[in-house]
C-alpha cells in the first residue's frame, strides 16, 4: 500500500491497496515489512528522475543484519520483543556480535540499493551526526563525497540556514527519505525532514518517504510545544512523545499547513504488518549515544538532564540509562564519563559521578510509566541547589517545551502532579493527529 498525499488538492489518495489489506497481511507474517523493501511500489516514482536521498547509517533496507546478537535473539519473533525475554533482549548492545570477535554484517543501504537498481542518485542529505552517524550531537557536518558510491553528500549546516538552498534542490527531482527516528520531539531527525519538505515545497520537488516503525509509537505523552520555545530541539506543536512514524508526521505537517511554502508533493510508502502497539526493535544505533533498546525507551525521561547540571551518562557505554553528579550523595552506584567516539567532551569528563543505574529496571515498568519525571525530581532534591540545577540558560525549557516544568519542580510538585497538567495536551494532540495515522492503534 502506498498512501499518497496530493499537495495541490490536499487530499489523501490510496494508490495501491487499502488499510484493510495491511491488517489482513498481519495474519500471514509477523515480520514488519519496511517501506524501503517495497521497491515495486515506489520505483515508478523514481524512474527517469534525478534522486536525492535523506538518510544515515540506519537506512538499511528491511533492517537486514547477520552476526548480531540482538538480531539473532529477535529473529524468531520477527524483529519484535517476545514476552518472556523482553528485559534480557533490551540490554543487548546494538553493536554486540553473535560470537566474541565476530563481525556484524548489515544488509544493503538504501543508497546502494537504489543505485544497484538503476536509480539516478545525485545527492545525499544527512542529519545531525552525519551520514555515517559518528558525529557528536549538534556537531556541524560539512559537505563531502560518499567514498563508497561517489555520491555528493550535501550539508544542512552551512551558510546559516538548515533549509537547503535552491542551488541544492536544483540537483534533484525527487527526494527519498529513509531514516530511523525514535519518535520524540527533541530527537531532531524530524526537524531535518521538515526543513527538506520546506525546500521541496518552495521549489516544486517531490518527496517520497519510505516509512519505518516508531519504536516509541505505542503511546503519546508530554506537553505540546509552546511555540515560543521553538528551537533546534523542538520545531512543531506536537507532544513530547508523538507516537507517529515519520510518514505519518509528514502527512500531518502537510495537512496542518506547517510549511511556510505551502505544501509539498508527498507520497508515503507504509510498512506492512505494523501497528501502533508493535514493540519493534532497531538493529543499530539511530545516533551515537543510543546504544541499546533500553536507551530508546528511557530517552523520553532522561533526556531532560541535558538541560540540567546532571550527567545522563554521555561518555559511558550506557548513556540515557543512568544519571548522576559528583556532588550527589546517598547512592551506591557511580560512573566516570570518558572521551569516546560520539561523546568527545562529555559533562564531568574523568570525574566520578554518583547516582542511579536504570539498566535493570523492568522494561514493562518503563513502558507503563511513559515519561517519568521522578528521575529529574530525585536529582533536583538530592543536590538541593535550587534554580542552579537547571544551568545558566533555558535549555531545560527548550526540551520541556513549556515554561511551567521548572517552577513546578522547584515548588515541590510530584511527578504525577506535573504529568496531570499535560493530560489535556495529550488528548487534544491525539485527536488532532488522528486523520494522519496510517497504522491501527491496536
Each language-model region and where it sits:
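Short internal beta-strands
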Residues: 120-128, 210
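N-terminal phosphate-binding or glycine-rich loops at protein starts, especially the Walker A/P-loop
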Residues: 31-81, 87-119
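Glycine-rich, aromatic-lined ligand/substrate-binding cores of catalytic
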Residues: 272-351
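Conserved anion/nucleotide-ligand pocket segment
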Residues: 229-302
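Conserved functional hotspot residues or short segments at active or partner-binding sites
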Residues: 319, 323-423, 441
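Glycine-rich, charge-decorated loop segments at or immediately adjacent to ligand/cofactor-binding or catalytic sites
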Residues: 132-137, 208-230
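Glycine/threonine-rich flexible loop motifs
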Residues: 181-193
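Glycine-rich oxoanion-binding loops at beta->alpha junctions
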Residues: 137, 142-171, 184
Amino acid at each position: 500500500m502506498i498512501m499518497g498525499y496530493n499537495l495541490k488538492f490536499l487530499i489523501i489518495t490510496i494508490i495501491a491497496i487499502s488499510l484493510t489489506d495491511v491488517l489482513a497481511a498481519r495474519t500471514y507474517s509477523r515480520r514488519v515489512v519496511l517501506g524501503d523493501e517495497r521497491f515495486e511500489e515506489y520505483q515508478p516514482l523514481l524512474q527517469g528522475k534525478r534522486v536525492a536521498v535523506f538518510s544515515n547509517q540506519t537506512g538499511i533496507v528491511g533492517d537486514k543484519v547477520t552476526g548480531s546478537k540482538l538480531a539473532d535473539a529477535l529473529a524468531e519473533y520477527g524483529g519484535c520483543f517476545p514476552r518472556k525475554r523482553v528485559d534480557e533482549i533490551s540490554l543487548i548492545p546494538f553493536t554486540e556480535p553473535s560470537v566474541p570477535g565476530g563481525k556484524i554484517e548489515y544488509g544493503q543501504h538504501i543508497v546502494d540499493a537504489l543505485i544497484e537498481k538503476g536509480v539516478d542518485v545525485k545527492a545525499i542529505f544527512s542529519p545531525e551526526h552525519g551520514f555515517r552517524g559518528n558525529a557528536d550531537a549538534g556537531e556541524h557536518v560539512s559537505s563531502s563525497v560518499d567514498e563508497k558510491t561517489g555520491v555528493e553528500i550535501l550539508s544542512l549546516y552551512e551558510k546559516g540556514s538548515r533549509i537547503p538552498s535552491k542551488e541544492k534542490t536544483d540537483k534533484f527531482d525527487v527526494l527519498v527519505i529513509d531514516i530511523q527516528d525514535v519518535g520524540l520531539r527533541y530527537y531532531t531527525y524530524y526537524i531535518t525532514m521538515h526543513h527538506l519538505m520546506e525546500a521541496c515545497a518552495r521549489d516544486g520537488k517531490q518527496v517520497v518517504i519510505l516509512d519505518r516503525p516508531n519504536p516509541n509509537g505505542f503511546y503519546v505523552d508530554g506537553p505540546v510545544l509552546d511555540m515560543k520555545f521553538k528551537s533546534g530541539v523542538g520545531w512543531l506543536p506536537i507532544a513530547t512523545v508523538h507516537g507517529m512514524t515519520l510518514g505519518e508526521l509528514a502527512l500531518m505537517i502537510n495537512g496542518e499547513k506547517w510549511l511556510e511554502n505551502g505544501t509539498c508533493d508527498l507520497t508515503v510508502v507504509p510498512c506492512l504488518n505494523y501497528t501502533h502497539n508493535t514493540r519493534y526493535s532497531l538493529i543499530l544505533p539511530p545516533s551515537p549515544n543510543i546504544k541499546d533498546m533500553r536507551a530508546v525507551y528511557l530517552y523520553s525521561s532522561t533526556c531532560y538532564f541535558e538541560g540540567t547540571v546532571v550527567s545522563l551518562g554521555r561518555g559511558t557505554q550506557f548513556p540515557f540509562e543512568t544519571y548522576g553528579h559528583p556532588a550527589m550523595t546517598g547512592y551506591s552506584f557511580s560512573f566516570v564519563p570518558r572521551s569516546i567516539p560520539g561523546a568527545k567532551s562529555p559533562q564531568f569528563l574523568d570525574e566520578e559521578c554518583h547516582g542511579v543505574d536504570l539498566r535493570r529496571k523492568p522494561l514493562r515498568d518503563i513502558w507503563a510509566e511513559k515519561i517519568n519525571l521522578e528521575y529529574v525530581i530525585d536529582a533536583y532534591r538530592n543536590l538541593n541547589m535550587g534554580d542552579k540545577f537547571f544551568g545558566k540558560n533555558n535549555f531545560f525549557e527548550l526540551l520541556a517545551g513549556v515554561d511551567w516544568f521548572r517552577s513546578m519542580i522547584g515548588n515541590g510538585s510530584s511527578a504525577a502532579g506535573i504529568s496531570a497538567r499535560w493530560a489535556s495536551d495529550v488528548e487534544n494532540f491525539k485527536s488532532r493527529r488522528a486523520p494522519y495515522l496510517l497504522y491501527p492503534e491496536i
